[in-house]
């Protein structure tokens, strides 16, 4: 038994800057009754083609929808996803096909500790896109072990790009990022 530790740079080449995410309704990452809740090779292998297509189109990652109705948001390839909707931090509830990330849990617990409204629930892609249009969705960000906090500047769905937070990092994502990296660096 041994442990290897190694300092690394930012997970994304652009560092802590908003990423571009493509929503996939063509492919799925995990299915009901499967092992989407665990880090297994099969979950990653199933996502390779969609991620390749996203990168060829200039997107950083893929946002996965549920495998049955293909309308409920699940997670991004390398991180869980959060939305700031009407000043409430919302993330998809764990359904067995979403990885219960430790950074996800940290965001939920910190948000509650700070007195922010935090909710886990089912969120449709249409709710998010309509919220981006009418301003009720003010931020989108991911949370993961490697990425820590990653602001989303663009969501693409069915060939249409939707800008988030004017393409800038929002204050909620920034607060979580600064706090979590502050813990890491001391």
Where are the regions a protein language model picked out?
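Helix-start/capping segments and mature chain N-termini
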Residues: 2-186
């Amino acid at each position: 038994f041994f442990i290897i530790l190694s300092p690394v740079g930012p997970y994304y080449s652009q560092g802590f800057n908003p990423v571009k995410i493509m929503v996939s309704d063509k492919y799925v990452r995990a299915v009901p009754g499967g092992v989407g809740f665990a880090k297994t090779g099969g979950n990653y292998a199933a996502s390779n083609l969609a991620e390749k297509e996203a990168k060829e189109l200039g997107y950083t990652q893929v946002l996965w929808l549920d495998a049955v109705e293909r309308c409920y948001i699940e997670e991004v390839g390398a991180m869980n996803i959060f939305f700031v909707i009407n000043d409430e931090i919302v993330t998809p509830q764990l359904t067995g096909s979403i990885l219960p990330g430790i950074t996800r849990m940290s965001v939920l617990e910190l948000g509650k500790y700070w007195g922010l409204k935090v909710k886990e629930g089912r969120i449709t892609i249409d709710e998010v896109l309509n919220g981006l249009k009418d301003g009720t969705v003010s931020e989108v960000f991911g949370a993961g072990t490697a990425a820590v906090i990653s602001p989303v500047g663009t969501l693409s769905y069915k060939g249409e790009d939707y800008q988030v937070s004017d393409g800038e990092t929002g204050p909620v994502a920034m607060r979580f990022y600064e706090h979590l990296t502050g813990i890491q660096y001391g």
